[in-house]
Amino acid sequence: MIHWLEHYFDKLWPICRSITGNGVRETLRIISEIIPLNIHEVPSGTKVFDWEVPKEWNITDAYVLSPDGEKVIDFKLNNLHIVNYSIPVDIEISFDELNNHLYYIEDYPDAVPYITSYYNENWGFCLSYNQYKILPKVGKYRVVINSSLKNGSMTYGDYVLKGES
């Protein structure tokens, strides 16, 4: 039982997923190996009570290079490093400009926070406070986010487990 559970944990853990996008679809595909899910798609912009399905977000890579070219924040090492729903970016900026887009929690110096920006088109990176403290404060940083934010759909799955009564 434990081996089976670890197998699926190892398949699901590295997938970057938010409320829309290919990560959700891949997650549901894997879960469908265990139970026969019914998969549904709800288009972006659909009103659901007092909520609206946001644009679809997908990401393939994101990183920050320090002034000396070292990759100091890397989405591929930990997908929590990206603010979910970050828009595409490829720029060189100062630390002061970058600092406006960095998120950390001083009280938990080793933790990487989870931040989202569903309805406010923006970008950002999350890192531990310990990572933040050692970033060089002088020089130009290169920031790259390979993502897309466009009309698409929100995917969800359901499964009805029939009772006996």
Language-model features: locations:
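N-terminal hydrophobic/helix-forming segments and targeting peptides
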Residues: 1-165
